[in-house]
């Protein structure tokens, strides 16, 4: 049973997450040549920008308004 872990900035709605999960699972199924959506788990991890750095840049400083 594959697990897809998605780490992203906080702020997506449940509906947006549902759409993301659907696209990811459908993409894996297409790429693998089949399978059942029910065999996948998608785990969303919401991360505050203040807790995410890319190199030396803190994301809350780099993207303060998004």
Spell out what each predicted region is:
Residues 1-66:
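A domain-level signal for the structural core that forms small-molecule/cofactor-binding pockets
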């Amino acid at each position: 049973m594959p697990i897809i872990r998605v780490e992203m900035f906080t702020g997506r709605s449940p509906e947006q997450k549902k759409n993301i999960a659907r696209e990811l699972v459908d993409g894996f199924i297409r790429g693998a040549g089949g399978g059942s959506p029910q065999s996948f788990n998608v785990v969303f991890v919401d991360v505050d920008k203040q807790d995410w750095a890319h190199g030396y840049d803190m994301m809350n400083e780099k993207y303060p308004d998004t």
